[in-house]
Design a protein with these regions (language model features):
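Short, basic/aromatic recognition patches that contact phosphate-bearing ligands
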Residues: 1-60
């Protein structure tokens, strides 16, 4: 999966749920948790309003 497609998928997954963990995103996208962390950081840098709580998960 290309990175652009993965970033789009992350946004879609976060929109449809209350809280989503990095582990859940990694399993759904078949990537490492480190890749999820990098992708979340890239989205946040682009201005996507993602909120994250350590040990809890991410939401939009």
């Amino acid at each position: 999966m290309r990175r652009a497609d993965r970033l789009f998928q992350i946004v879609q997954l976060l929109r449809g749920r209350r809280l989503t963990t990095a582990d859940d995103l990694a399993q759904r996208l078949e990537v490492s948790m480190r890749t999820v962390y990098r992708d979340i950081a890239a989205l946040a840098q682009q201005g996507v309003p993602i909120e994250g709580e350590a040990g809890v998960g991410y939401r939009m």
